[in-house]
Amino acid sequence: MQNIRKELVELIAKAENILLTTHISPDGDGYCSALALQRIISFLGKSSLLVTDDDDLSRYNYLQDGKSQEKRFSELKEEEQNFSLAIVLDCNSYDRLGERCVLVEKAEKIIVLDHHEAENGLIKAELSYIEPSFACVGEIIFSLLETAINKMPVSDRLFVCNCLYTTILNDTNNFVNANTDTDVFIFASKLVNLGVKPNEQYRYFFLQHSAEELRYIGETLSTIELHYQRKILFMYSTLAMSKKNNIDPESIMNATRWVQGIIGIEVITYLREEKEGVYKISLRSETIDVNRIAVRYGGGGHKQAAGCYFYGTLAEAKDKLLKDVINALECYNG
């Protein structure tokens, strides 16, 4: 760890301009880790730019204090697309970067900080720290840069800590997922000691729903189907649902959270239509390795929670995914 820390700080110190980025469809771990790391990099005397796709990230506005430097990939001018250092968070594969992979490929040096198993299209980096034992990338950042964080001005330090606490909430589902271990609670307690208020962060992250968003969730839940001896839960949402309720689905929590814990369910499969013929798939399971399924479709994640995209009709997606999930369950059950 000491050698990793030293190399990380040295690469940042030598960089002229730094790119921060994460996987497609950024979540509370990848995106908020990037926000936190950008502020730490600024404290270390360097500037950086956080680049995402055109996703709606407004649900994280409560964290913002007006100091973050961010741009969407589509907004970058040609002269802004060259970086001396690219830092990729919560992702270790070019396949998971979308269009932004060209920015990373062109960078003079690359750092990868991730807690997923190594995937296809592995990014070749000067420094690659991929450690699945960590619950979230935020935990990796804190473990590497805790000393610097403790030296930051109070306001900036609190910003960093709130962002890092959000990475815990996102990837442990508020300390209930199987990846919640002793180290996670130690990490969280350190953040609380530095000023984080857990009740506030929980409320901001999980409880900010409009009536329209809840109607959308209700319509999604009404599509629930049970398959394979009631062990598989399948549900979906469509563009028509989001249009009817005048919401952007990206601005709310993944709908799988509303159905976790149903008795007898071993796998949750949720399809959300992003645009015509394109579905974002979320897979959850306490038994089978859903990451293996997601990887087949160019996605990835963790053993118990993974995602990918499907290009085709809802019927085609449902048919293929259910076959894959049933096959995985049959193999698991022998």
Placement of each model-derived feature along the sequence:
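Short alpha-helices
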Residues: 115-187
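Glycine-rich, phosphate-binding/catalytic loops in enzymes
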Residues: 36-38, 103-106, 129, 186
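Hydrophobic helix-and-loop "lid/oligomerization" segment in the mid-to-C-terminal part
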Residues: 2-24, 30-64, 71, 76-85, ...
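An acidic intrinsically disordered interaction segment
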Residues: 1-6, 101-111, 133-141
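Active-site cofactor/cluster-binding pocket
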Residues: 67-127
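Short acidic, glycine/serine/threonine-rich loops at helix termini
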Residues: 32, 61-64, 100, 122-125, ...
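Short hydrophobic "helix-edge" motifs at membrane interfaces and signal-peptide entry regions
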Residues: 17-18, 104, 160-162
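Short, motif-level signal for alpha-helix interfacial/capping segments enriched in acidic residues
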Residues: 2-7, 91-93, 148-151
